Amino acid sequence: MEKLLALIVVLVILLSLALFYLCNILWLRAVKIRKKLRRQGIRGPKPTFLYGNTKEIKRIRQELKLSQKQGTNNFISTLFPHFLLWRETYGPVFLYSTGAMEILQVSHPDMVKDIGRWTPSELGKPNYLKKSRKALFGGGLFTENGDEWAYQRKIIAPEFFMDKIKGMIQLIEDATVPVLEAWEDMIDDEGGCREIVVDDYLRNLSADVIARACFGSSFTKGEEIFCKLRQLQKAIARQDSFVGLSALWKYLPTKSSQEIQMLDEQVRLLILDVAKEQHHYQDSHNSLVNAIIDGAQDGRSAAEAEDFIVGNCKTIYFGGHESTAVTAIWCLMLLATHPEWQERARAEAMEVCRGRSTLDVDALRRLKIVTMVIQETLRLYPPASVMMREALTDVKLGSIEVPRGTIVQVPRLMLHLDKEAWGADADEFRPDRFANGVAAACRAAHMYVPFGHGPRTCIGQNLAMAELKVVLARLLTKFAFSPSPRYRHSPAFRLTIEPGFGLPLMVTKLP
């Protein structure tokens, strides 16, 4: 009897501790953060217990998302109408809650600038991203903080310096040829012009570039990895629609979470196979995978080394091809709907490519108009809509003391469309605003953050820009593009911003 009583006491204590822990995670910690910020004058919508403002977000989306005008580049009102409403109500800095998280949204220029001066040990990637995006990014560079982030960046970043990119341009050219040939064959069969849904072609092209440049293999060999990562992206995006208390479902053995777990394990095994096959294969184009494998051996157990390899390879596979692909897709959409800029970019590409079987770095530098088109596309359609950080210690942004545990959210779309920073034509496609560089394009350069801001600026931006320039230049010298009657302008958020119903274009072969 005494043993049973003792067991009951232990169970009651453990249950009490578990309940206190859950209460702290789901409510008390958030209340403390909210009080500290509100004492400093930070306002925001009033949250409810467990759900925070998630029910209000759903209501606002239902009421306001239909206000978007068809064809406009400013689609914030469709995807994030609550951001617009709360900014109008509370100003460029406000606080809202998703239940367990207090999110400080910052779009004030001075505070955005301040974010860039904090290190990843102080203002790093949120822990919830490491958990919710683990299947896509593992424990790689995208999600790590502190010393581990610094170590991984030191290993990987040099592989994307310009001296390495020079050697990748031919690989980009090689990956572009199959798309050019496929489109030419399709168009020839239709008498010189036909509709092509370009999305998958550009995704496969970008995936092929990453496979060739970083892993020493072709897209065909890595096709299964990219296919499963795309499935993972869609599954996680669907799961992300659960917010507030319902977000707890993603940690239960539901059909969705089981699908993600299965795909995650399949991708893991495929990546390890590719990495083992390529390791120590002495080829100048697979030095990245060797650098990752060598870096994984630094005092790690076998299991930890595998996690290191898989996490960083996932980051490069997914992050390296998806954002570049969707940018190329939006570039073609904007050029198709702005024929005057398409003609200007084509004339420049014709001049630069004339007599060249392969472009080089000097040729890419001469593509001034093409570069402006890419920069303007990244302004209007940044692949990642928000930049997320977590205060890992107490930090100060402007005059605001931000307590540890606060999620700091920077809405890229709102920065890029801010009329005070960009002028009254901020919603319009005007590549010439970048004619004299980013500094002259807007009043504050830190209001343009397609590749991030501060020490966590994307390491792959040199490769992305080189790839986009080569692909656009080659496509423009071969084809003319115009909108298909079937195109429906409906940007969708699926971890990246992409056309909701694909991008069908009328493609004409040039003489």
UniProtKB/Swiss-Prot annotation:
UniProt entry tagged with the keyword Cell membrane: no
One example GO MF annotation: iron ion binding
Keyword annotations of the record: Heme, Iron, Membrane, Metal-binding, Monooxygenase, Oxidoreductase, Signal-anchor, Transmembrane, Transmembrane helix
Protein's membrane topology: Single-pass type III membrane protein
Cofactor: heme
Listed EC numbers: 1.14.-.-
Residue intervals on the Cytoplasmic side: 28-511
Main subcellular location: membrane
Subcellular location per the Swiss-Prot or TrEMBL entry: Membrane
Positions annotated to bind heme: C458
Residue ranges crossing the lipid bilayer per the database entry: 7-27
Class of the enzyme per the UniProt entry, highest EC level: oxidoreductase
Name listed for the protein in its UniProt record: Cytochrome P450 714C3
